[in-house]
Curated annotation (Swiss-Prot):
EC category name: ligase
Similarity comment: family membership: Belongs to the AIR synthase family.
A Gene Ontology biological process term: adenine biosynthetic process
Annotated gene: purM
Keyword tRNA processing: no
Protein name: Phosphoribosylformylglycinamidine cyclo-ligase
Matching NCBIfam families: purM
Keyword terms of this UniProt record: ATP-binding, Cytoplasm, Ligase, Nucleotide-binding, Purine biosynthesis
Listed GO CC annotations: cytosol
EC number in record: 6.3.3.1
Length: 333
């Protein structure tokens, strides 16, 4: 175990500074279109919503982040396309929208044999799971800017205006259903790489907790696409949705000002326990950085909770309270 107690900021990512940068950028975006295409919400939720008559169009944009560096190290690129689509689609699902179309942006230092084919395989698989089309994209070779490659995309979805879920219907006493993640997903990888580097492990080493796969294999496990949430929306009275990504549970503040009591959270996968031990990362920092086994949350009345859990393979993990975010006895702040 590392004698250091690493944080996300130690690895070079300061969430508070990042939030300041985002706020500064948003403050400059003052022009607002009127009529068809007018924004229905402010910037800052999981997806942007646009007026389209009876419907709302929903848009998201996101990328895979520094997980691509591990893909390069392993020379295995067939999963990061799934990650790219998942990060966008899950944000659409978090406001209740159905994904319909996607465009990707691939920037790279140089072209490598088999690289584009594997990227395409992942994008196709993600699109099939999401039941949407990839309608275009951009590929740029930028050797003076990019070292390795970067993969991002933009996703379009739609829903009826009356079906928009922003969290305004969340009430104290509502139940929280947690849906398992597949592992680290696509956030926190700057800290992950720092931990691996300082621990003396290699991505090619067998996992200490499962010798049948390498550490790199486990870290490249693709982000789960929670498309079954659309089935929950048809069958249940849903009050709120949350995609657990960067900043971990802290991002729940964008859903509601009420509190979250996770009295029975999902068990984090072994990869999280390994990272916590090797990096000397405390539990608070882990929950402020990673999904910790819970990749998506559904907030709804108790009467529908078991049905939602059955549809998604999740379970009841907590309830809505007056204030704060708590995982058992741990206060997340």
């Amino acid at each position: 175990m590392s004698e250091k107690h690493l944080t996300y900021a130690d690895s070079g990512v300061d969430i508070k500074e990042e939030e300041k940068t985002v706020k500064t950028l948003i403050d400059k975006l003052s022009y607002v279109r009127k009529g068809i295409g007018a924004p229905l919400t402010g910037i800052g939720h999981y997806a942007g919503l646009l007026d389209f008559g009876e419907y709302a169009l929903a848009m998201t944009t996101d990328g895979v982040g520094s997980k691509v560096l591990i893909a390069n190290e392993m020379q295995r690129w067939n999963t990061v396309g799934i990650d790219c689509i998942a990060m966008n689609v899950n944000d659409l699902l978090a406001i209740g929208a159905e994904p319909v179309a996607f465009v990707d942006y691939l920037a790279l230092e140089k072209h490598e044999e088999g690289f584009a084919e594997q990227i395409g395989e992942g994008l196709l698989k993600g699109a099939e799971i999401s039941r949407m089309s990839i309608v275009g994209g951009e590929t740029a070779t930028l050797p003076d800017i990019i070292k390795g490659f970067d993969l991002a995309g933009t996703c379009l979805g739609y829903l009826k205006k009356e079906d928009i879920i922003e969290g305004g219907r969340v009430r104290v006493g509502d139940v929280i259903v947690g849906i398992p993640s597949t592992g680290v997903h696509s956030n926190g990888y700057t800290l992950v790489r720092k931990i691996i580097q300082e621990s003396g492990y290699s991505y090619h080493d067998p996992c200490p907790y499962d010798s049948s796969k390498t550490i790199g294999d486990d870290l490249l496990e693709p982000t789960r696409i929670y498309i079954e949430v659309l089935d929950v929306l048809k069958a249940c009275e849903v009050h709120g949705l949350a995609h657990i990504t960067g900043s971990g549970l802290l991002k729940l503040r964008r859903v509601t000002k009420l509190g979250f009591d996770f009295y029975d959270p999902l068990e984090p996968q072994e990869i999280f326990k390994f990272l916590r031990k090797e990096g000397g990362v405390d539990d608070l920092e882990m929950y402020r950085t990673f999904n910790m086994g819970m990749g998506f949350l559904i907030i709804l009345p108790e009467k529908d909770a078991e049905k939602a859990a059955e549809i998604t393979g999740g379970k009841i993990v907590g309830k809505i309270v007056e204030s704060g975010i708590r995982v058992k006895d741990l206060v997340i702040e």
